[in-house]
Amino acid sequence: MNIDMANSDDKALISEDTAHQISADPWYQVGFVLTTGVNSAYVLGYSGSVMVPLGWIGGTCGLILAAAISLYANALLARLHEIGGKRHIRYRDLAGHIYGRKMYSLTWALQYVNLFMINTGFIILAGQALKATYVLFRDDGVLKLPYCIALSGFVCALFAFGIPYLSALRIWLGFSTFFSLIYITIAFVLSLRDGITTPAKDYTIPGSHSARIFTTIGAVANLVFAYNTGMLPEIQATIRPPVVKNMEKALWFQFTVGSLPLYAVTFMGYWAYGSSTSSYLLNSVKGPVWVKAMANLSAFLQTVIALHIFASPMYEFLDTKYGSGHGGPFAIHNVMFRVGVRGGYLTVNTLVAAMLPFLGDFMSLTGALSTFPLTFVLANHMYLMVKRHKLSTLQISWHWLNVAGFSLLSIAAAVAALRLIMVDSRTYHLFADL
């Protein structure tokens, strides 16, 4: 089986039918899709969720190492996009082709959990941004976080009704980048100003020895979460041939230029506030009300766009399996179908987000339950299965080491994340106003 697309037929068959548009986007558009995920408003939490538990040395080394291993694992997965003369446009299609039907179902379950949790986190994040904006003008406790989360879910649903598939984002990716630059620049500048005026910062890693163990493991899961989508084959399905060469360009863009804003705001936030950094950086910064309001509203709007990327595999599944398959994407019956089906999906997302608004815990649990297995364990093992006759003993040992190591990390991170959720659940009630 040759998975090197440099010499393969660009007109390879597609693994299964799909109701969504594929093979239409240039590599740089896909690069911006990936960068939109990396620089989503989640970056405003990494100073608190990664740097505070790990400190300067652990956090810095962790971010760089996580980027390197994520680029490597995603490149492996990208090279598996075509096997047996077919382009496998879904992660589950690829796993099913290599392992069989049971693994198809397991991969789909893992991916569903991954994307559902990410989308839940996005809705929590959007709700936090809305509440932070309201509090700047009226801190009267009237507009509570669950109400903001409900409003965020409604806006996300409206956006989902109007964007039929991932490739249709196009100009919205430009808006997403613009919004990202606004809140990242404001957070960076205000943190820099606060850091200069604040005399001494405490960078001590908080918590008891046992608590630090769990928070460190959770931070490692957050590192993995920061760079990975868990849906690379679905994103790669939108790219023009040659699909591997173009996808590698998009990945290099994501992990070089595309990740610079993440590093800048994460390091600056931790430098300015130390171990007291909030899990939502804009809650820590001081500055003019209108500037902070603009940053929060930009974070809210960018989150609405970013959520659509991570919800697109579920939308594609629903549209392909249950949609009419007739008429254009904006035919009235197709629009009404999206309103009913996508609206229902996002309603469940929003309900879970409002019930358990513990953003950092969701990031950790998502990284543990699905990002580790999908991005690192499966990618390395699938590459072994496909290329085992062409790999040296050393290469085989390396991939098995990755499979075993990341499996253990996944289990440890899941335990740590569940512990954090249980602790927070005892501290806060359902539908808490955090």
UniProtKB/Swiss-Prot annotation:
Membrane-spanning intervals of the chain = 26-46, 49-69, 106-126, 149-169, 171-191, 213-233, 251-271, 297-317, 339-359, 362-382, 403-423
Tell where it localizes: Cell membrane
Extract the Pfam families matched here. Answer: Aa_trans
GO CC aspect terms = membrane; plasma membrane
Citing just one GO molecular function, the answer is:
amino acid transmembrane transporter activity
GO biological process terms, alphabetically, are: amino acid transmembrane transport
Instruction: Please provide the record's keywords in A-Z order.
Output: Amino-acid transport, Cell membrane, Membrane, Transmembrane, Transmembrane helix, Transport
| Topology in membrane | Multi-pass membrane protein
Q: InterPro entries from the xrefs? A: AA_transpt_TM (IPR013057)
Q: What does this protein do?
A: Proline transporter that mediates proline transport across the plasma membrane.
Give the family, as the similarity comment puts it. Belongs to the amino acid/polyamine transporter 2 family. Amino acid/auxin permease (AAAP) (TC 2.A.18.3) subfamily.
According to UniProt, the name of this protein is Probable proline transporter 2
